Amino acid sequence: MKRILLIVILFLTAMAVFSQDMTSYKDEFMRTDGTFDERLLLLEAVRDAGLTGIGEFYHDALKYFIVRAPDIRTTTDRNAAEKSAVILCQGLGAEKYTDAAGEIWQIVELFDVAGDATDGNAMQAALIALGQVNAQDFVPHIAQRLSNFNTQSITNPETRRRVQMAVVGSINALEALHDIRGYRPVFFVSVGSYDPSIRQIASTALPNIVDDPGDVSIEIIRDTSSIPSVKLTAWNEMLRTRAPDTSKARVAAAALEMGWTYNTTNEGYRKNLSDMRKGAIDAIRQFGISDDSVYANLELSYSRNFVNNTPDYDEIVKTLNTLTAINTPESVAILYKFLQELNGRRRNGPWANKERQLFEWVVSCLRRTGTQSPDVRILLTTISRTDTYTSQERIMARDALNTLSGTR
């Protein structure tokens, strides 16, 4: 029987190469007495013939395949059916046959890797095909499936293998569909407990899903359930995008804010938050101020380090340079406030190496702003004439004042 069928298939293949008439194939595939093995042989012949423009055939065949799915009873039937589903989905994907999206999704459900008897190939092929046929209506379904995988804790190696096949299919689909709703679940694959190769696939896909995932990035950074390492990764991923500067500035503001509002005693997490703050401060210098809340958080990056016994001088320098580069009345006012505080310390103490270093940096920053603020000029004049300062410190203040006055 199989030999006769194969001869018929080869004959039909030769006909189809020249005519592209798939009627005979369709009739043979839909024989009511056909087996899953026989249908698989026919599909393999179609695939190997390299025919094109046959999306309608694949679609009709898939519809019939779904109708006959309840007939799957044995392991042999299931293996042949899964291989057939792969060929059908790959064919529809290659043809970009959008009308078949609904049936392709049924294959996702029919061969869900949650079933122990399913290998994972068919589900992966179906998910990939959904991206290829531009199945926009199914973005929420794919994103939800991927989110569900992200929340699972899987210890069985075989189950893990099958799930990761479906995860790769989901990533591929969401990358192809370019919808922001796919960004969050793919991001959480990149920071999840999957194999490194799977996480890398997700990370590589992220910049291709949407140009500007700013809103989603802010949600992840502000999410109280996201640990600092995840927040830091979300921030760094935002920097890799093609988002406009205004969007990156908004996310930078959120990253800086969360870097100060998230409380933890975990040293690793505190390092994550510090790195996120410093990256955000650099970005604000580059992309600008998105809202006035940034000023208060920049001030925190200076003041909290100022009172710390082990200050992060790198964060202080980045903050001062950013305030100088922004050069708005608000940023100059903050620099002026810093100098006022240092002036108070010079009079009343303590005044040690830390204060001397900060004094030098703040005076230099005010000089570089070119500000014409009367308050700044008066304070610099006072410092230049106060004996409690060293001659070097008074000279620094005088030089800054002369620069602002345009005399040097």
Enumerate the language-model features and the residues they cover.
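Sec/Tat signal peptide C-region and signal peptidase I cleavage site
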Residues: 13-19
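N-terminal alpha-helical scaffolding segments that mark the starts
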Residues: 32-34
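Amphipathic alpha-helical scaffolding segments comprising HEAT/armadillo-like alpha-solenoid repeats
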Residues: 20-30, 51-73, 95-113, 135-156, ...
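Short coil/turn segments at helix-helix junctions and helix-capping linkers
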Residues: 193-194, 388-389
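Sec-dependent N-terminal signal peptides
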Residues: 4-13
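Structural detector for internal amphipathic alpha-helices that build alpha-solenoid repeat scaffolds
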Residues: 36-53, 73-98, 119-136, 155-179, ...
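Alpha-solenoid helical-repeat scaffold
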Residues: 377-382, 389-395
